[in-house]
Amino acid sequence: MAAPEPLRPRLCRLVRGEQGYGFHLHGEKGRRGQFIRRVEPGSPAEAAALRAGDRLVEVNGVNVEGETHHQVVQRIKAVEGQTRLLVVDQETDEELRRRQLTCTEEMAQRGLPPAHDPWEPKPDWAHTGSHSSEAGKKDVSGPLRELRPRLCHLRKGPQGYGFNLHSDKSRPGQYIRSVDPGSPAARSGLRAQDRLIEVNGQNVEGLRHAEVVASIKAREDEARLLVVDPETDEHFKRLRVTPTEEHVEGPLPSPVTNGTSPAQLNGGSACSSRSDLPGSDKDTEDGSAWKQDPFQESGLHLSPTAAEAKEKARAMRVNKRAPQMDWNRKREIFSNF
């Protein structure tokens, strides 16, 4: 008995005949999306392996899962004489939903990723081969996931980009809070918990939430976002290196070797570390050496006067008070795109 065909989407390329493409498209009540209702025998649709019951995912490379029937029809008609349809049968559709996978053309060629793969669908920056364990996730079996930033190209859809941006009080930066399934954000590879590094080539790590939102909206219909997942973020912070677009495909920063600082290896200026041993010699910017009080850097002194101690305690209480919320700007904490 032959083994069952593996589940995968199908990419159907249709060339229009004298009677059209030969299929009927319709929406189903209670189900999201557009479905193939009927395929005419001997038609271009049948020759392209389109089948009744298929759900339409993409038209000519554009995801249409969130579009209306009229919008989908117009996309099919937009390219004269031919069209490219990415579809899934019911069984494949259910498997994709169960595993929370976004359907792509790559899956039509390679099939669905292994069920045990924690990074499905496999991102562009995942490679295999021999790499340093400092720059990748260890895997005894051989494959390594390189810890690289990801450059996500988003083109705005009718419902926007399809992601929610928020700031976290416990840590600096802007984070992807959620990504809508089937949205431009999902198709670009953006994922929840990603930290935003750059918007359209500009570093936004030091910007306020409203400023980052303005940067994303600066271009009307598209955005280029450089992001890092939590593991990659931790790795680059450990090396004290700021991720850039060059790290997406170019050389990765090296870990500390023979006392060389990561910043020097990355081509930047070396900065002093707060983990230096107490009393160690350091060079000031003009090259002169000085001894550092091990408590001075943290704002403490070994022998404060009573007045100093009292003033310091008062200042610490003031600094701990949370700033009053400006309720007119409360919505800046979360922004939907």
Curated annotation (Swiss-Prot):
GO terms for molecular function: beta-catenin binding; cadherin binding; identical protein binding; phosphatase binding; protein-membrane adaptor activity; signaling receptor binding; type 2 metabotropic glutamate receptor binding; type 3 metabotropic glutamate receptor binding. Keywords: Cell membrane, Membrane, Nucleus, Phosphoprotein, Repeat. Widely expressed. SMART domains: PDZ. Residues 107-144, 240-337 are annotated as: Disordered. It comes from Homo sapiens. It is a peripheral membrane protein. The modification Phosphoserine is found at residues 130, 183, 254, 269, 280, 303. Homodimer, and heterodimer with NHERF1. Binds PDZK1. Found in a complex with EZR, PODXL and NHERF2. Interacts (via the PDZ domains) with PODXL (via the C-terminal PDZ-binding motif DTHL); interaction is detected in glomerular epithelium cells. Binds ADRB2, SLC9A3, P2RY1, P2YR2, SRY, RDX and LPAR2. Interacts with MCC and PODXL. Interacts with SGK1 and KCNJ1/ROMK1. Interacts (via the PDZ domains) with SLC26A6 isoform 4 and isoform 5. This is Na(+)/H(+) exchange regulatory cofactor NHE-RF2. The gene is NHERF2. Scaffold protein that connects plasma membrane proteins with members of the ezrin/moesin/radixin family and thereby helps to link them to the actin cytoskeleton and to regulate their surface expression. Necessary for cAMP-mediated phosphorylation and inhibition of SLC9A3. May also act as scaffold protein in the nucleus. PANTHER family: NA(+)_H(+) EXCHANGE REGULATORY COFACTOR NHE-RF2 (PTHR14191:SF4), PDZ DOMAIN CONTAINING PROTEIN (PTHR14191). One of its GO terms (cellular component) is nucleus.
